Curated annotation (Swiss-Prot):
This is 1D-myo-inositol 2-acetamido-2-deoxy-alpha-D-glucopyranoside deacetylase. Catalyzes the deacetylation of 1D-myo-inositol 2-acetamido-2-deoxy-alpha-D-glucopyranoside (GlcNAc-Ins) in the mycothiol biosynthesis pathway. GO terms for molecular function: N-acetylglucosaminylinositol deacetylase activity; zinc ion binding. Pfam families: PIG-L (PF02585). The gene is mshB. PANTHER family: 1D-MYO-INOSITOL 2-ACETAMIDO-2-DEOXY-ALPHA-D-GLUCOPYRANOSIDE DEACETYLASE, N-ACETYLGLUCOSAMINYL-PHOSPHATIDYLINOSITOL DE-N-ACETYLASE-RELATED. Keywords: Hydrolase, Metal-binding, Zinc. It is an enzyme of class 3 (hydrolase).
Length: 297
């Protein structure tokens, strides 16, 4: 399928989030000819740096990690086939807040402290320009509780409202039909833990889902995108984020700075937050993010 009428917007908090949770989906839709737009809310300045030779870039040293990660993200987008990328408000407008409770939560420019209306107005401008039928971000809990993920959810929900409001701002109003949050079913994680346990890789193994810090009950997952054919693109994108991610030389496995092994999924899962639900296909779920939209499925 090649359909330039399909337009989808992904709103992510930091560089690498797009590749970890939605990389295969982005690569699939880009390869099919859809307009895939990625908006990143921060530069990821507070990330923990894996390569020892680059640790001088850390926020408590030279504080130049953010600018370095711009290059990583550019390389990752190229691997995914994504040509439309923007930083919300421009590169560096908002700063990575760090994990919940960290002193960096109090930085005056951190995204956690951003005025939601201001950030939403800027995102609404992008929505009106791109005119996506589908928007993807996180749930209200921020997937695993990161303050920037929570804020990205709040900003995206409000921006979608503003973009559709004829009384708001300049430009032609646009109503994005569907809003999704990233999600991983607990049963999928359980199978992944078993696979990680029985496979060869250099990472630490976990024995329970709770050790991963994310995963949702299966009945909350409405949609699965089978993008296994695009897993190589996702792995290439993960490798591009070398300050944050290590990818195994064998198998679809990776780890962040905590060295806990995770599976890179080719099938990616979502929860429909708002909009028409398409017909159930796989495991009672939609089989695509454009499902239920006439002429776009």
């Amino acid at each position: 399928m090649s359909d330039t009428d399909r337009r989808i917007l992904f709103v992510h908090a930091h560089p690498d989030d797009e590749s970890i949770s939605t990389g295969a989906t982005m690569a699939k839709y880009a390869a099919e000819g859809a307009h895939v737009c990625l908006v990143t809310c921060t530069l990821g300045e507070e990330g923990e740096i894996i390569p020892e030779e680059l640790r001088h870039l850390a926020s408590d040293k030279e504080d130049r990690l953010g600018e370095f990660r711009i290059g990583e993200l550019k390389e990752a987008c190229a691997a995914l086939g994504v040509t439309d990328h923007r930083f919300l408000g421009g590169a560096g407008r908002w700063r990575d807040s760090g994990m919940m409770g960290a002193p960096s939560n109090d930085h005056p420019r951190c995204f956690w402290r951003a005025d939601v209306e201001e950030a939403a107005r800027l995102l609404a401008e992008i929505i009106r320009e791109v005119r996506p039928q589908v928007i993807v971000t996180y749930d209200e809990h921020g997937h695993y509780g990161h303050p920037d993920h929570i804020q990205a959810h709040r900003v995206t929900v409000r921006a979608r409202e503003l973009a559709a409001d004829p009384a708001h701002g300049e430009g032609e109003p646009w109503s994005a039909a569907k809003l999704y949050a990233t999600a991983t079913p607990r049963t999928v994680l359980a199978r992944s833990i078993a696979l990680m346990r029985d496979s060869r890789h250099p990472f630490e193994r976990v024995s329970s889902i709770d050790q991963l810090g994310y995963g949702v009950p299966d009945d909350q997952v409405t949609t699965v995108v089978d993008a296994r054919a695009h897993l190589p693109a996702k792995l290439a994108a993960l490798r591009a984020h070398r300050t944050q991610v290590v990818v195994a030389s064998e198998g679809p496995f990776f780890a962040l700075s905590n060295n806990i092994g995770q599976q890179a999924f080719g099938a990616e899962y979502y929860t429909l937050l708002d909009g028409p639900r398409g017909p159930a296909v796989a495991d009672g779920r939609e089989s695509g993010l454009f499902s239920g939209l006439p002429g776009l499925e």
